């Protein structure tokens, strides 16, 4: 019987072979566990119109499942808000938390395929860090991912992408994401 080797994601290999050592030299870490890494990626798609038409949530579930390769969790309203005609328990969005190899593959596809496909893309804002090295940004449409068939899109949906790192400061997080290939704008 032959033992098949599991193929490691390209970005994970690059992180382990090059980026980790470069970050250790740059910030002078004494311990290997201090070197920042990406912990998880949370992709969220808000579907506010689903309060009026419950079928719209299915399109968001399908799109997010195609993009991330994982079944999304349907998020429901916690409180009723009369002005928005929203009742407690109505579906208002879908969310996926990616960890491990799926996370590395998603980040690789995001930086090498999806972000360059955005029209008039000038780079990501370097100011959207939260103070402890985590980065959040939004995409206006799901069509930038090649997994989504443009002809089968029922409506354009944006998404929020939250990259959670183990970095202690914004500078460490920025250095990590820049090394991973995130195209930040130069000030």
UniProtKB/Swiss-Prot annotation:
UniProt KW keywords: Ribonucleoprotein, Ribosomal protein, RNA-binding, rRNA-binding, tRNA-binding
Matches recorded under Gene3D superfamilies: 3.30.1440.10
GO biological process, one term: translation
One annotated GO molecular function: structural constituent of ribosome
Database matches in InterPro entries: Ribosomal_uL5, Ribosomal_uL5_bac-type, Ribosomal_uL5_C, Ribosomal_uL5_dom_sf, Ribosomal_uL5_N
Top-level lineage group: Bacteria
Pfam families assigned: Ribosomal_L5, Ribosomal_L5_C
Transmembrane segments: none
GO CC terms, sorted: ribonucleoprotein complex; ribosome
Family named by the database record: Belongs to the universal ribosomal protein uL5 family.
NCBIfam families in alphabetical order: PRK00010.1
Its job: This is one of the proteins that bind and probably mediate the attachment of the 5S RNA into the large ribosomal subunit, where it forms part of the central protuberance. In the 70S ribosome it contacts protein S13 of the 30S subunit (bridge B1b), connecting the 2 subunits; this bridge is implicated in subunit movement. Contacts the P site tRNA; the 5S rRNA and some of its associated proteins might help stabilize positioning of ribosome-bound tRNAs.
Subunit structure: Part of the 50S ribosomal subunit; part of the 5S rRNA/L5/L18/L25 subcomplex. Contacts the 5S rRNA and the P site tRNA. Forms a bridge to the 30S subunit in the 70S ribosome.
Protein name (database record): Large ribosomal subunit protein uL5
Organism: Mycobacterium tuberculosis (strain ATCC 25177 / H37Ra)
Gene: rplE
């Amino acid at each position: 019987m032959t033992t098949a080797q599991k193929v490691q994601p390209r970005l994970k290999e690059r992180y382990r072979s090059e980026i980790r050592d470069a970050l250790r030299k740059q910030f002078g870490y004494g311990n290997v566990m201090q070197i920042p890494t990406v912990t998880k990626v949370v992709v969220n798609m808000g579907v506010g119109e689903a309060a009026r038409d419950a079928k719209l949530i299915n399109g968001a579930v399908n799109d997010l499942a195609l993009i991330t390769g994982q079944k999304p969790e349907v998020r429901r309203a916690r409180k009723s808000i009369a002005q928005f005609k929203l009742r407690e328990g109505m579906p208002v969005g879908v969310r996926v938390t990616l960890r491990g190899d799926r996370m590395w593959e998603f980040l690789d596809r995001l930086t090498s395929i999806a972000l360059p496909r955005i029209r008039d893309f000038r780079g990501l804002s370097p100011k959207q860090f939260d103070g402890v090295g985590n980065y959040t940004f939004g995409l206006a449409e799901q069509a930038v991912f090649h997994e989504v068939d443009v002809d089968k899109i029922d409506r354009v949906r944006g998404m929020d992408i939250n990259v959670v790192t183990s970095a202690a400061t914004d500078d460490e997080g920025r250095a990590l994401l820049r090394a991973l290939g995130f195209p930040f704008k130069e000030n």
